[in-house]
Amino acid sequence: MAKEDVIEMQGTVQDTLPNTMFRVELENGHVVTAHISGKMRKNYIRILTGDKVTVELTPYDLSKGRIVFRAR
């Protein structure tokens, strides 16, 4: 997926799901299922319920995303 094709949005982690998946509520109110990006997994960045995150969405499926950043 090319970098230009992604939609970046801010959201809050609502729930933790199995296999490092998370339910994230975006700023616009939509709820998506997101997984952790490879760099976050490699650097052991922990994500907890209530964390503010940046999610990349593909224009082809707006119900799934990738967490690329966790705000402090």
UniProtKB/Swiss-Prot annotation:
It comes from the Bacteria. Residues 1-72 form the S1-like domain. InterPro entries: NA-bd_OB-fold (IPR012340), RNA-binding_domain_S1_IF1 (IPR006196), S1_domain (IPR003029), TIF_IF1 (IPR004368). Disulfide bonds: none annotated. One of the essential components for the initiation of protein synthesis. Stabilizes the binding of IF-2 and IF-3 on the 30S subunit to which N-formylmethionyl-tRNA(fMet) subsequently binds. Helps modulate mRNA selection, yielding the 30S pre-initiation complex (PIC). Upon addition of the 50S ribosomal subunit IF-1, IF-2 and IF-3 are released leaving the mature 70S translation initiation complex. Belongs to the IF-1 family. This is Translation initiation factor IF-1.
